């Protein structure tokens, strides 16, 4: 397996972590390159990285957990949780936020703008719709931030504390969150741009006391480790966090990402029907960091990789574009090796 990964990343000065699991067994777990060039700290499977939009599948899991607990219904109109909404948005449901079919705009400001929860809701509800709710898929980060608001309203606690209590703690994930893990700075990867210049750590940018401001909260920005993502995979396999019904809801293909395309969106996951079976995946990045989480449903396979330098002008590479090839190569090797067992 190491040879497969090396064939994709070895010549590209890859900096990050790769973890591959078959069922509950970790097949490969390795760090590459530097987490911090200045301090000469190497990346390891314990290094904390920004997950980007891989955060969305945790937000979706929190929503179906709340439904499992009887605290909300995904068919609830958002007005049940956000209060009065403009006439054009009265038909929007929680489920439409989950599937990016609410017709909302992608964002209502920059990720690092100091936007409070109240102002996020005000801006999101005031923004014109792209399409009539329920009629088309339009990826919306603001929709997932609204889900984080709904999670807080339905749970009576903060978004991060609910995830920590109901998802991360049962899965034995101690290194995932915004601020609750209280990491040392040296444990978190520094991000680098395409020129190799430091862009700091996620919390070196405008950051509230409890995590990122609300243009990012719920749709991105969680930090985690490869080891914790493996624990999440195991928790899904043994239904420790979400029961079978909840997981069927999570991984059901619901809306095509594009007309005539072969990829569908479920709740926080992109779903594909492939030669090795149904695949669920999501990626996330900001031009500096990039993460990709893939699960082959029914086979118990998982591939996670993350980098703190997604692109290189000097090297002429873009790992956001190469990521699918890396994941596909690893999955093919996993399936082939499983067939020989």
Located regions from the model:
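Structural recognition of the beta-strand scaffold that forms the well-ordered cores
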Residues: 17-19, 50, 96-98, 138, ...
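Short active-site loop at a secondary-structure junction
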Residues: 9-17, 38-96, 131-142, 217-220, ...
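Extracytoplasmic/secreted proteins, especially bacterial periplasmic and envelope-associated proteins
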Residues: 3-4, 53, 58-62, 73, ...
């Amino acid at each position: 397996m190491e040879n497969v990964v090396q064939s994709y990343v070895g010549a590209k000065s890859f900096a990050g972590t790769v973890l591959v699991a078959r069922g509950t067994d970790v097949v490969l777990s390795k760090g590459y390159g530097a987490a911090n060039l200045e301090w000469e700290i190497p990346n390891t499977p314990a290094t904390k990285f920004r997950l980007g939009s891989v955060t969305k599948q945790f937000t979706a899991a929190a929503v179906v957990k709340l439904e499992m607990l009887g605290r909300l219904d995904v068919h609830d109109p958002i007005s049940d949780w956000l209060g009065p909404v403009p006439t054009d948005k009265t038909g929007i449901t929680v489920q439409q936020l989950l599937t990016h079919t609410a017709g909302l705009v992608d964002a209502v400001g920059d990720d690092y703008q100091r936007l409070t929860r109240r102002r996020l809701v005000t801006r999101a509800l005031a923004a014109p719709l792209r399409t009539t709710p329920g009629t088309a898929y339009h990826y919306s980060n603001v929709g997932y931030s609204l889900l984080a608001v709904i999670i807080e309203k339905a749970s009576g606690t903060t978004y991060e504390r609910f995830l920590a209590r109901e998802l991360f703690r049962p899965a034995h994930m101690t290194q995932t969150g915004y601020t609750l893990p209280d990491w040392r700075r040296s444990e978190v990867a520094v991000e680098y741009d395409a020129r190799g210049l430091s862009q700091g750590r996620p919390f070196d940018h405008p950051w509230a006391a409890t995590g990122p401001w609300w243009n990012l909260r719920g749709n991105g920005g969680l930090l985690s480790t490869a080891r914790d993502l493996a624990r999440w995979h195991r928790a899904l396999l043994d239904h420790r966090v979400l029961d079978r019904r909840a997981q069927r809801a999570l991984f059901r293909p619901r809306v095509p990402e594009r007309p005539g395309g072969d990829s569908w969106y479920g709740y926080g996951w992109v779903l594909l029907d492939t030669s090795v079976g149904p695949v669920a995946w999501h990626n996330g990045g900001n031009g500096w960091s990039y993460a990709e989480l893939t699960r082959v449903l029914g086979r118990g396979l998982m591939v996670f990789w993350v980098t703190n330098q997604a692109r290189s002008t000097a090297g002429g590479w873009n790992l956001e574009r190469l990521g699918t090839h890396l994941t596909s190569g690893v999955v093919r090797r996993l399936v082939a090796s499983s067939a020989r067992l």
